[in-house]
Amino acid sequence: MDRRSLRGYPLIFSYLGLFSMLIGIILLIPLIMVVFYPHEINQVQYFLPPAFVLILFGFISKILYAKYDKERLERHQDAILVVLLWILAIFGAAIPFILTGEFNLSQAVFESSSGFSTTGLTVVDVTRASRVFLFYRSVLQFVGGAGLVLVLTATISDKFGMRMYNAEGHGDKLMPNLIRSGRYILAIYLGYVIVGTILYIIFGMHWFDALNHAICAVATGGFSTKAQSIGYYQSLPIEITTIFLMFAGGTNFFVHLLVITGKWKSALKHIETKSFYIITALAVSISTLSLISYYHGSFGTALRYGAFHFISAVTGTGYQIIPSFTGLPSFYFGLLIVGMILGAGVGSTCGGIKQYRVGLGIKSIYWSFADKIAHHKVIKKHFINKLGSKMIVDDDDISENYSFILVYLIFLMIGALIFSLVSQASMQNALFEFASVLGTVGLSVGITGYDAHPIILWTSSVGMFLGRLEFYVFFVAISKLFIDSKRSIKHLLQKA
């Protein structure tokens, strides 16, 4: 590449070295469980070697490119860095699964992608897995829920951090400095995990199960230590606790901060807070009505199962309290698909289109009709309430919003068609499964799993990756690489 194109790439490699060391450290965290379960000391062999290699690789890379630390990233190179960070994390975290000899590359990458993207679909038999590996899966969801870039910059450096954080799919920031923002987010995050763990223990969970379920509920990840998920416990208090944690994880972290600082009105007026709670309330009511006859006229049972699973779907958590989704009324089944597509809050741990975009879409439709029937053709300024302050919305904002929704739905249909074609599943089931993949949810009708075709697994891994990064980051990164490569080739040809 020519000098102009090359500028910033050495800094990317320097950051990758730093991040490689961080991934190596993450691989060591699950070994804490060996202290509590000494008989699982043999699990060390699956984590220590790859952790050492990743840390060593990162250290060498950091030394080689240390002199470039004062360089600046060029425009859109932050997107390239974020994409490469995620790819490094996914493949690095897949190594322990491969070393067990029980998983091939497709399965290991699928599990790692599901962890970091906080999806919760799995190829692991949790009834046979060691506690070290079960905790490892939860650690992946904890880190992925907070955001890989956030964890990196909050613990190490803020240089270019905010640009990367926004590129990772987070639309808001708590404070101008990402280190402070990151530490506040992690404090809120950890606070909910601690509260959730304590409540689960009080209501009868073993401490290990309580810790894992609390982590994965707040991360809206959905990995469980039980094959039956939350349904294993058949406990209403545990289900209510899970709903509370799912809501917490699905809410924008900035909204949490507004509530904590006493700014309740600002939190409630926020556009996606209204959208999220109004849509959820309506959907839960409709879900309950649609399930009453299915549960033989029991309103309480219909409310319990209808509310839990819709909230699990819309927050992108994926926990369930029934053995299977097959046989459910088709209307409710479709409602769950809609919930998975919509998603919850921007700046939360969930996936999907996100409630900010849903709210803006609904508002823009209203504005369009209102402008058309207005008596006088006047140009009106449109506003939305965003995190306690009014924000002007122009045509570009509306166009960009609809563009994202359209791209999301196109990818959803492509993925569903691939699932249906390869697995021979009905289009309804394929749409459900890929909506779960793309929305990083984790609810499943059985298309994904240990015995799934490699095409299904790789399509899922790509879908989870794109769903977590929200498409545009990936497109921008690929475009930037293509443009720089083209410019470099042209430069070389001119020299020749």
Residue ranges, per PLM feature:
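Membrane-proximal intracellular helices of multi-pass ion channels
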Residues: 1-496
